[in-house]
A protein has these predicted regions:
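Loop-helix junctions at membrane interfaces
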Residues: 1-212
Length: 212
């Protein structure tokens, strides 16, 4: 098994470095394409902190379905501020969660990619729609994004298992169907939860803006 890992290591490191470069490029591009006000930075920081707390709170279990509540601040950030907000909340929140739980490892960048992708994709869609969604549009966007996130998580699990010598197709792919269904269920729940949170934050920000 060690020979197999040594043979695959250059490939794995190439993937990890490529993912890191893509994330850096995405952050730089979105940052330059958006005016980052102090209020926006504070809101993104707050949502990032909420993500870390919810990530440690775990998931809501409904039988064999796991609902990930940590995705809420990422989706809210994307719906409020588009790809910049979504990407930064997902990227920073997932990085802090990984750092506090596992420290920095060879696959840290792979584990933060799914939430960064969720925020970026939902944010791009939000901007495309002028930040106004119907329930149907939001449902399709969140379910589609959930499928991408599940695929990225599965890829991260596989690469992590190979690098750390516990590779098992049963472990990585055995629960794939359950993860897909759980992701879709989480997306549907967020359709009902995220918009009221976004509206509440918008009203709060408008109040602060008026007071100034």
């Amino acid at each position: 098994m060690s020979l197999q890992i040594e043979a695959l290591s250059p490939i794995m490191w190439t993937i990890i470095i490529a993912v890191a470069l893509v994330l850096i490029a995405a952050v730089v591009f979105t940052w330059k394409s958006s005016a980052m006000s102090t209020r926006k930075m504070v809101t993104i920081a707050m949502l990032t902190a909420v993500y870390v707390v919810l990530n440690f709170a775990g998931t809501v279990r409904l039988g064999w379905i796991n609902i990930s509540v940590a995705s809420l601040p990422v989706i809210v950030g994307a719906m409020l501020y588009g790809p910049v907000g979504g990407l930064l909340v997902g990227l920073l929140g997932a990085f802090m969660g990984q750092l506090l739980t596992y420290g920095v490892t060879a696959t840290t960048i792979l584990w933060i990619l799914p939430q960064a992708a969720r925020g970026l994709l939902v944010g791009v869609y939000a901007k495309h729609c002028g930040y106004k969604f119907s329930s149907g549009q939001l449902t399709l966007a969140l379910i589609g994004t959930a499928l991408v996130v599940t695929a990225l998580n599965t890829g991260a699990m596989y690469i992590d298992s190979v690098i750390y010598n516990y590779d098992s197709y049963a472990y990585v792919f055995g629960g794939l169907v359950v993860r897909i269904i759980s992701g879709a269920a989480t997306a549907v729940l967020m359709v009902f939860v995220a918009p009221p949170v976004v509206n509440l934050l918008n009203r709060s920000l408008d109040t602060v803006r008026t007071a100034q």
